[in-house]
Amino acid sequence: MFPSISNISLSPSSLFTAYASLTGFLMLFRSLFNDEVPERLRSYITDLLNRFFTPKSKNLTMVIDEIIGFKRNQVFDAAEVYLRNKIGPETARLRVGKLPKQKHFTIYIEKGEEILDTFENSELRWTYVESENEASQKEKRYYELTFEKKLRDKVMNSYLSHVVAESEETKRDLRAVKLYSRDVRASKDDDGMAGAGWGCINLEHPSTFETLAMDPGAKKKIIDDMERFLKRREFYKRVGKAWKRGYLLYGPPGTGKSSLIAAMANYLKFDVFDLELSSIYENAQLKSILLSTTNRSILVIEDIDCSSAEVVDREADEYQEYEEGYYGRVTLSGLLNFVDGLWSSFGDERIIVFTTNHKERLDPALLRPGRMDMHINMSYCTGLGFRTLVSNYLGLGGLNHPLCEEIEALIDSTEVTPAELAEELMQEDDTDVVLRGVVSFVENRKVEISKTKELEGSTCRKLDGDDKHNVSSTNDLKKTKKKKKGGKGKAKGN
C-alpha cells in the first residue's frame, strides 16, 4: 500500500517539494492557531510546550544581596569574609585593601570571579556580581551561590550557618584585642563603649604562653581549662550555671600575673576590662559598670587584697554603714553577687580574674569553693621557667651554654622572680657575660635570703628570751609579795 523507504526518491527537487509543503502547512496551522484559538488557551498551550521541551536544570542558584531593605545582609558580609580563606591559585583577579589601623592586608574577589567550595563532600560555587541599579544609579553587589537542587536543605540548615560561624571566627582572629579602662579617654574606636564610661587602647602586649616563664605543666593546665570552657556553652546551660570562669592569681610581685592575663587575652582574643574598685562609690554604680562590659571579655580586678580596703564588710547593715560613714559604698557582698550570685548570669563567655600578692589577707568569702574556679599560684621562678627566659632573651644558643645547668640548680634552691631574672638577662649582649652576671646575682640573692632568715631567727629567739625573763621576773615579784604578806601576818599574830 505504502512505498518502501528504499523506493522513495531523495533527489534535491523532491526534498525541496516536501520542505515547501511542510512549510505551507505550518504557516496555515499558525494562522488558524492565532485566529481561532482563544488567547488564554494559546498562552496555556505555549507555556506547556515550553516546559516540556526546555531541558530541566539540576542546579539551584541563590542570590545573596548586599542590602536587604535599608540594612546590610549578614549573610553577604559573612560570605565576604569567609571567601577570603577560600581563594585559590585559579582565581585570576583580586581586590586588595588596608585601613590605617589594620595589621594585615584584606583580600576580596573581583567582579565575575568564581570560587569553588566543598562542604561535607558536596561542591558549591560562589560568584561575585556587580550590576548597575538603574533606579538609584548605584552598583548593586551580590553573590550567587550555585549548587545541586538536592542540596537545598543542607545549604539552608547547615552550610550557611557554617559560613557565618567561620566568618565570625576569622574576624575575631584578625580583630585587635582592646584594653578598656575608665581612666582612658573615650574615642571613636571604643566600639560603642564610650557611653558606659569605658575608654580603650589596643592591647599590644607581646606576652604569649610560649614566652611566659612558667612551668610547662602549669601553662598546659591553664590552656586546657580555657579551651574546655569555650566548648562548654551547652554544658553550662544544661547544668544551670552562668557561662563564665573565674581565676585567682596569687604570688609575690614580679612573678608574671599581669603577663599571664595578657597571654590569656592574646590566646582567646578576648578584650580586657581593667576595673579599679577605688573609683567606684556604691553597689549601684558597680552594677551599672559591670553590665556595660561585653561578651568574650576578661574582667580584671588587680590587687584585690588592697582593694578590700575600699570594700565594706559584707555583714554590716545599712545603719552601721551610715554610722561609720560608709553608707552607699561598695560592699563585698555586692561584688560577690557578680562573681557567682544572681547577677553573675549576665552575658556569655566571661572570664573574671582577681590578682593578689597576699592570698592569706583575702576575705574567706573570696576563697570559698566554687567562687573562683581556679587558683593559680604564681610562684618564684623555677629552672624550667628560666630556660624559657633564656630562649626569649638569648635565643636557642643560650640554652646550650654550660652555665645554664648551674643557674637552674641555683634558682631551684632560692627565691628569685622572673622579672628580676629578665632584668639581668637584658644587661649585656654577650651571652657569656650575661650568664655570669646571672650566676653572681642568684648567689648574692641566696646569701641575702640566708642572712634575712638568720636575723629573723635571732630576733624570734631574743623575743622568746625576753618573754621568759619577763615571766621569771613576774614570778619572783609574786613570791616576794607573798613573803611580805606572810611576814606581816606573823607580826600581827605576835
From Swiss-Prot:
Subcellular location: Membrane
Name the UniProt record assigns to this protein: AAA-ATPase At2g18190
CDD domains per the UniProt record, alphabetical: RecA-like_BCS1
Gene Ontology molecular functions: ATP binding; ATP hydrolysis activity
Membrane-related topology note: Single-pass membrane protein
Region (Disordered): 459-494
Listed cofactors: Mg(2+)
Induction data: Induced in roots by salt stress.
Amino acid composition bias (Basic residues), ranges on this chain: 479-494
Enzyme Commission code: 3.6.1.-
Transmembrane parts of this sequence: 13-29
